[in-house]
Amino acid sequence: MIIASLFEERAQGLYHNTTAVIDADGAYLGKYRKNHIPDDPGFYEKFYFTPGDTGYRMFETQYARIGTLICWDQWYPEAARITALMGADILFFPTAIGWDTAETSEAANREQYEAWQTIQRSHAIANGVHVVSVNRTGIEAGTRFWGGSFVANPFGTVLYQAPHNTPVTQVVEIDLRLNRKYREVWPFLRDRRIDTYHPVTNRWIDKT
């Protein structure tokens, strides 16, 4: 199975940050277009990319039901929750994120990386799924990409973490039976009060 990240030229001047999913037998299963487009120092993607319009996607592969979310999507619990509710057993996050080499310290770098890993491990716990986050390494245009790709189980336990500075290829075995186990122990999906969540669709909740 391949999750291929690409810059999709949909039309002249219309570009998406996209992943294509190809199954183990070579069958093309579909694509997901990145929904959340950042515009912050070092990551001015709104200049290049249009927000996705595929909605969130779940793909039935020969090995598991998977969801793909791209980079900045990983900071939004709503994206992970919706993809999990669609039936995904594993959430994949292809990523290119790092530090400004001129402005950060080792302490700040460590704090940012830990925040990045923590938010994704929380998606694993809250949704009872495995998370696979794959980040690039190296330096480009003043950004040192922090690597540190990792795999977490539904309890948020890190099963593997890659080095920060060296690209690696790693096979990690996961047990999808743990999804059911942890969802039965911590039945967060069962206990959701979906009738109370409408306010989350507001940009901000103003005082009345």
Locate predicted features:
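Short, glycine-anchored, charge-dense loop/turn motifs used at functional sites
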Residues: V21-L29, A152-L159
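A short, polar/charged loop-to-alpha-helix boundary motif
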Residues: K34-Y48, T166-E184
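Cysteine/selenocysteine-centered motifs that mediate thiol-based redox chemistry or coordinate metal-sulfur cofactors
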Residues: T54-D89, F93-T95, N179-T208
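Short beta-strand scaffold segments in enzyme catalytic cores
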Residues: A4-L6, T18-V21, R57, S149-V151, ...
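Short glycine/acidic-enriched loop and turn motifs that connect beta-strands
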Residues: E9-A11, I139-E140
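Residue-level detector of high-confidence beta-strand sites
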Residues: T18, K31-R33, Q161-P163, V171
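CN hydrolase (nitrilase-like) catalytic-core segments centered on the catalytic cysteine
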Residues: M1-I3, R65, C71-T169
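Active-site beta-strand termini and strand-to-loop segments that position acidic
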Residues: D23-A24, F59-Q62, N153-P154, I174
